[in-house]
A protein has these predicted regions:
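Residues that recognize and position ribonucleotide moieties
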Residues: 38-39, 47, 72-74, 119, ...
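Short loop/turn motifs enriched for small/polar and acidic residues
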Residues: 32, 77, 114
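Catalytic strand-loop segment that frames the active site of acyl-thioester-processing enzymes
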Residues: 10-59
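Hydrophobic residues in beta-strands and at strand termini
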Residues: 27-31, 83, 130
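N-terminal amphipathic/basic-hydrophobic helices that include classical n-h-c signal peptides
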Residues: 1-9
Length: 157
């Protein structure tokens, strides 16, 4: 089942909306990801968002090994999270992610963390830039236009 969710930014929401496939990454809250109260330590959500972003790209054929070999990058330039309900050690969750906007050289991802019983735990977003390292990973990176072929891989059918 492919869900179609759309989102947008700014005044031209209808123009900028992108109907994306929704990707799901299963995660489990482990002891080392909790604070002393036994609930999720807030940076864990950001780690899960990052893992979900890389998982999405791997699922459409842009896995980390390929991106590194082709000198491609998608650095994070902005991230936010709304904490709705605390996860507890051992909770099984899913990070549901989609792309809500493609700009010329940047894109926005929306993430939602759901506990296995469907309880929403957190919602967040990331803005990333599409780029290429000039001389390989670790060298200077420049933003690049996002290929239409890549956008098509994320588009909901």
């Amino acid at each position: 089942i492919v869900l179609i969710l759309s989102g947008a930014m700014g005044k031209n929401a209808a123009e900028n909306a992108f109907k994306s496939k929704v990707f799901s990454l299963p995660v489990q809250l482990r002891w080392g990801e909790c604070d002393p109260a036994g609930i999720i330590f807030y940076p864990t959500y950001f780690q899960w968002f990052d893992a979900a972003a890389w998982n999405m790209f791997a699922e459409v054929g842009y896995h980390a090994k390929r991106m590194r070999a082709e000198h491609l990058a998608m650095p994070l330039v902005s991230a936010d999270c709304r904490f709705l309900y605390p996860a507890q050690q051992g909770d099984h969750c899913a990070v549901r992610s989609r792309i809500t906007h493609f700009g010329g050289k940047s894109f926005v991802l929306a993430h939602e963390v759901l506990r296995e019983d469907g309880m929403p735990l957190a919602k967040g977003s990331e803005t990333r830039v599409w780029g290429r390292f000039e001389e390989g990973p670790g060298s200077r990176m420049r933003g690049q236009a996002i290929p239409e072929e890549l956008k098509a891989r994320f588009r909901a059918v």
